[in-house]
């Protein structure tokens, strides 16, 4: 009985920890970050346009995403590539 109780406690702790560990890309080079509490979305959004036709993007964890035709807003690990 004690083993079952201990197992349930461990599973609960692991599940609670997984709920707060969203990971997002924070750079074009592939650097990642575990998002702070309250920021449950990953985002990639266009911040400027280069003369050669390319967009410059910003990658981050966020609580609310920017709107735009070239932006990505998602809620799973490493989804904002």
Curated annotation (Swiss-Prot):
Main subcellular localisation: secreted
Location relative to the cell: Secreted
Tissue specificity statement from the Swiss-Prot or TrEMBL entry: Expressed by the venom gland.
Keyword Zinc appears in the UniProt entry: no
Alphabetized InterPro entries for the sequence: Snake_toxin-like_sf
UniProt GO MF annotations: acetylcholine receptor inhibitor activity; ion channel regulator activity; toxin activity
Cysteines paired by S-S bonds: 24-42, 35-61, 65-73, 74-79
The organism's place on the tree of life at top rank: Eukaryota
Leader sequence segment: 1-21
GO cellular component: extracellular region
SUPFAM superfamilies, alphabetized: Snake toxin-like
Keyword entries, A-Z: Acetylcholine receptor inhibiting toxin, Disulfide bond, Ion channel impairing toxin, Neurotoxin, Postsynaptic neurotoxin, Secreted, Signal, Toxin
The protein's role, per its UniProt record: Snake venom neurotoxin that blocks neuromuscular transmission, presenting a postsynaptic action through the nicotinic acetylcholine receptor (nAChR). Has no cytotoxic activity.
Annotated family: Belongs to the three-finger toxin family. Short-chain subfamily.
Protein name: Mipartoxin-1A
